[in-house]
């Protein structure tokens, strides 16, 4: 690795925007990789270093470049829940169907973690598929219930997903719906939301993932 590429990686990791600009001006490659195959843009996203990320996007950095764990800058926005970073990457044309190592799109980890602002923004500002199913057989709706804490943030995430058209009858790979998971976990508020959504949808529409 040449010294300019190393400086760019270090600057992106630290969020040093001036150093990012200087490294690029000196000839550093926007798609250079560290030992874990992380690009400068991915390092900036992981640290939520917005200005550094914006400079890298302007230099043509790829929001879909995966690292050794199949994480990419775009996918990581769903993990961190950073709405401002999500918006910074949109001009770069992220692949909304890109999957992480679990087969999930960015919406799914955001729903799991209760990132209300991110879920609201990505549903409103992109064409992300609300009922995408990962390799575990879970949609964002299922994951919010199965791995969430049942509190107010996850209730709001479920409301947003349902309002965006999430199918409350979609079951996991074992045939269990989000409503049934909510009941099993003792999440009364989520169970009420999901039962009402099933009622509105008109009967048992379960067709599987």
Where are each of the predicted segments found?
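Ankyrin-repeat inter-repeat connecting loop/turn
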Residues: 30, 63, 96, 129-130, ...
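Ankyrin-repeat-protein effector appendages
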Residues: 1-7, 136, 146, 153, ...
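Intrinsically disordered, low-complexity regulatory segments in ankyrin-centric signaling systems
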Residues: 1-26, 35-38, 54, 120, ...
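Ankyrin repeat A-helix N-terminal signature
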Residues: 10-15, 43-49, 76-82, 109-115, ...
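Ankyrin repeat structural motif
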Residues: 16-24, 49-57, 82-90, 115-124, ...
């Amino acid at each position: 690795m040449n010294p300019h590429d190393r400086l760019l990686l270090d600057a992106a990791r630290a969020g040093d925007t001036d150093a990012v600009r200087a490294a690029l001006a000196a000839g550093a490659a926007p798609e250079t990789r560290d030992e874990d195959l992380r690009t400068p843009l991915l390092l900036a996203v992981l640290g939520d270093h917005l200005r550094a990320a914006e400079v890298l996007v302007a230099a043509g950095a790829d929001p879909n470049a995966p690292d050794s764990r199949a994480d990419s800058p775009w996918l990581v926005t769903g993990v961190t829940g950073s709405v401002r970073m999500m918006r910074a990457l949109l001009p770069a044309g992220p692949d909304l169907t890109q999957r992480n190592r679990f087969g999930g799109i960015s919406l799914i980890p955001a729903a799991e973690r209760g990132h209300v602002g991110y879920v609201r923004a990505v549903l409103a500002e992109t064409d992300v598929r609300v009922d995408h199913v990962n390799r575990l057989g879970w949609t964002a709706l299922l994951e919010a219930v199965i791995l969430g804490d049942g509190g107010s943030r996850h209730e709001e995430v479920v409301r947003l997903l349902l309002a965006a058209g999430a199918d409350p009858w979609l079951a996991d790979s074992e045939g269990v719906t989000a409503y049934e998971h909510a009941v099993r976990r003792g999440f009364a508020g989520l169970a009420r939301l999901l039962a009402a959504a099933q009622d509105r949808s008109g009967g048992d529409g379960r067709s599987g993932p």
